[in-house]
Amino acid sequence: HPPFGHAGEETLNDLMSSNNGFEHNQQSLRIVELLESKYPNFPGLNLSYEVLSGIQKHRTPFDQPDLDPSDTYLSLEAQIVNIADEITYTAHDVDDAIRANILSDTDLIKNVSIWREYSNEICSEYTNLTDKQYVYLMNSKLITNQIRNAISNSKQNIQRSGVTSLKDLESLTNKDLIMFSPEFRAGIDELREYLFNHYYSNHEIYRSNKKGQLIIRQLFLALSSDFKLIPKEYYAEMSTDSKERIICDYISGMTDSFALSEYQQLFS
C-alpha cells in the first residue's frame, strides 16, 4: 500500500484519474516487473507466474467487498496470502482500536460474540492478568484460532474438491478453497462489521485519513510543479514514463513517516 493505506490509495487514484489511475495490486506488479532493477539483462525480479498472479489478483474484503469470487481465478498460494492478510489486519485493527482507546474490551464483550467467547476462556484460565497481558492473550487467541480454522476447513475443501493441479483448480465452478468454515466466518464478519461501524468510521480515524490525503495531494502538486524535487537517480531510468506516473511511483513507495517528513520540509 502507499503511505496512509487505503486513504492514500484513493487519493493517488484520484490524482491519476487521467493517467490510468492507481491500484495497489497493479502497482505491486509494476514494482516487481519494472521498477526493481536487480539484474543487468532484464527489468524486474523475474518472478514466477504463480507469484505474479497472486500479486495481481490479491484481494481482501476491505479492498473489494463486492467482488464475486467466481470472477477471478486465484491459485491456492494466492488464496493463502489473501486469508493470511485478513487474519493479520483483523487482529491488528482490534489491537490498535483498544490501544487508541477508541474501543474498549467491555464494548467488544457486549457486542461481539467471538470476543466474548475468547474473553471467557482466558479469564477462566488466568487470574491477575494486567490489561496489557489480557489484550495480548486475546489477540494471540484471535490469530491462532483463525489460523487453525482456516487450515482445518481448507484441508477439507481441497480433499472434497479433488484438486491436484492448477488445471484442476481452473476447472472448478467455486475456485475459493482456502477459507474459514461458515460458522467461524460468521463470527469474524460480526467482528469486522463492528470494527467498521465503531473504529474505521471513528471521527479521529477519519481526521487522520484526511490528513494523510492532504499530505499526498500537496506532495503530488509540489512535485508536479517542480520535477527537480524528485531525486534524479530515481527517475533517470524511467524517462519513457509520463511525469505524473513517475511522481506517483515515487510517492506510492514512501512510508507514512517519510511522506510526512517530505511534506514538512516543503511546507513548514
Predicted segment positions?
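Aspartate-rich (DDxxD/NDxxD/DxxxD) Mg2+/diphosphate-binding motifs
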Residues: 1-18, 22-25
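Histidine-centered, transition-metal-coordinating active-site segments
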Residues: 25-27, 31-268
